[in-house]
Amino acid sequence: MSEQVGQREAVDSPQATGVKTPPEPCPLCRETGPPQPPSITEEGKTNEDIDFIWVACNKCDEWYHSACLFLGDEKWRGTIPKEIISTVETNFGDEGAWTNWVEWIGKWYCAPCLARSTSPSNPRPPRHPLVATMKRASIQPKDIDQAGKPLKRSASTSAPLLKSNIKRPRTSTKGQETASPEIDMKSEREQQAESTAGTPASDAPQGRPKRKTAQIDYRNLNNSIATPTHQWLELIADPEKYGRTILDANYPALPGKLLTRAWLESQPLPGQPSSISPDLLPTRFWGPDREPLIVRPENGGFSSLGGHLPSKDLTVQDVANLVGPDRMVDVIDVSSQHSSQWTLQKWAEYIQSSSGNTSVRNPKVYNVISLEISGTELAKKVKPPKIVREIDWVDNFWRFSAGAGGKDVKEKGRGNDSRESSEIRKEGSHLTEGDNAGGEIEEDLEGLKEKTNTPYPKVQLYCLMGMKGAWTDWHVDFAASSVYYTIHSGAKVKLSCFVSFFSPGSYHSQVFFFVKPTEQNLKAYAEWSGSYEKQQDTWLGDMVDEVRKVELHAGDTMIIPTGYIHAVYTPMDSIVFGGNFLHSYNVDTQLRLRQIEIDTKVPQRFRFPMFDRLCWYVADKYCSDLRHLRAYRPRATTTPKPPHFRVLQCLSYLANFLVSQTGILEDPEAEDKARKLVHDRIPGDIVKDPEGLAKELKWRVERELGALGLLGEEASGVEAEEFKSNGTANGSVKIKGKEVSRKRDRLSKVFDKKAISRTWDFHPPAWSENRQSPQIETTTVQLPRPSTSSSDAISGSGPGASPGASANGGANENEQAELTTMLVKQTRKRMRELDDGTVIEESQETTFVEKKTVWGPKLDKEKISQPQGKVEEDMDIDH
């Protein structure tokens, strides 16, 4: 192939042949070649004299003639923005297709890519619809003048490539172009050198300037920057100017020592008295009115939470050294919202050059929000708060495999038991940084994480580094996971020549904007996040009930509860440590956000990693605990306590979710892709019988809730013997054939049984009826005579039709007729008294009206009448 291309290049070269080479066709060209402008025959030109402009699809990189697009059918012409089409036709007429209107295009997509993006068969549709865009909001007069100028052809015969065979890509720069696929391309450096040597400066190719168009940043959807930043910064700076209201949150600060799992589970059962102060209720974290928890330095700071941070003189260069200078990290350009990968060393050097100690600060504002540091030297200097470690699903339920010579999965599961029990024994005490209690257990867990040879969700340790002016748009953390967030204290200038990330005495803060996760607000967020247009031009605060603002300073720590919608503004350079965690106190919201992510087509790689698999681990562990809770212990001196009622309520949601997942596996009408997806996310090494585990968990949870009086008696009265017919969670009972089907049918009836109403034996008192005698009134009226045919009666002719209507569509004269109206009223009433003295009276009233109109041949002489008694007899209606 390379030899053929080289031969063609030699033959086509003007140096070799002295003849013109026909232009390269595009996929839309006709068999006769590219389209010719109307003036080509008048001026005596040929097709080889025309410089065809090329445009590439931003999705598939396929190249097309701009003229072929403009002159194509509606499918292809419709890919061009309408404003461009109207401007070209208005200013250039028939010659417009050959003008350089491509210069006005920002992003463009070909028809096949547009069709595929909306096709139901596309397994991975785009997050937002593909739409062609323009460089500017409107086309300026200078743009029109520039587009009408002809592209000059080089007069030099030493040009290495014919200009007619050169594509002008949408990202090409002046003096650099990309040859067509049929020409053997030299290296970029050689081509630039030859172009400089052989092409006059005045004849240099006029390509489009290179630019990076603003795009949605999917790499960091958890903290995405998906909208134009500048307008939101202006809005939050002066909300009143734009007619908006942002309230101060004024969330009360809490003492750090209070935040433990024991505090979360100190809420008594509904209806029972509580001795907890209203400001310290644990429902502030997991209740319907939950709100962010803030711990200030005066309340004990991060250390009082049982956490640990690096020393205060930590710099970005230190972060790079501890994590690895060559570690790649996603760096977000806040202004263009474009994400690119840098090494940490490059990031540290950029921050150093942008420090307040330098004379000139870099104008570009960047943000790093996705640096996960697990398994690094920096991770050894960071410990999450105790409450996070106590309730985090990953730490407490994930099955880590240590590999050869290490603990197996079952031993890790027993390690969970011992770790949790030891934490429960110490729940009344607080661990300071110097305490070693429980240290061996935590070290074992960290050792398992380091030695594991299987992936696990690494979301608990993040280092975030933001420059002044950074903005993180509205988002809910993946799977509605909770977040702990602490601002590292300001660094001092080192004695060495290195310039610190922070200038001395700088004021470090973060401003959070919160929207409460109510049902309506979550619906509004789902609508906003699922619409590219609304993310671009709609302030989410306009779609929700209210927006509240919280400002954090260096040393402050905040724990954001499940499902909170929030945005973040960084007014000063900052280093932040934080992480995400799932827990058992808001499972319903976590599952709800999982569904929102599916509905809004969030790519799987931007959701909580291995979420479904983690749910199965949680279900297996809790089901085992509930099974042991009811086990007979002949030598036991104490009785184990069931999980907190809030945990049981949330486990009910989890069980229903897992039952629905197994339902997909059992559904023969479900798509194979959906069934395989569910199957692959079940940890088969632990969960041998997914359906049995899900239903057993549902049954055991409902039994415990019933014992606490939080469920109907029927729901908690399912006998264990009935459940055992389906086997244990490990599938120890194996039954084949019809017996399995028969027992499953019986089980489904048990679990699908509806609770009987508490008023099933209630007999209300009888009604006392009062029926009035019919009231009959006869009057003489003037109405047109209706048609007696059935078709006309159906079409509306008759007394109810418009006056003057007749069978033939004409107008009849009014005739005298007799109208008889009968009115019947019936009322009934009943009254009962409850045990507490409440009296309830119910009444009903029914009115029946019947009308009859009679036309006669001689109404003016002979009155058509009927004895009143007979009419009443015929019309009497028995209710």
Curated annotation (Swiss-Prot):
A zinc finger (PHD-type) spans 23-116. Residues 786-818 have a biased composition (Low complexity). GO terms for cellular component: nucleus. Residues 416-598 form the JmjC domain. Its main location: nucleus. The keyword Disulfide bond does not apply. The keyword Transcription regulation applies. It is found in: Nucleus. Keywords: Chromatin regulator, Dioxygenase, Iron, Metal-binding, Nucleus, Oxidoreductase, Transcription, Transcription regulation, Zinc, Zinc-finger. Pfam families: JHD, JmjC. Residues 769-782 have a biased composition (Polar residues). GO terms for molecular function: histone H3K36me/H3K36me2 demethylase activity; zinc ion binding. Its cofactor is Fe(2+). The JmjC domain mediates the demethylation activity. Belongs to the JHDM1 histone demethylase family. This is JmjC domain-containing histone demethylation protein 1.
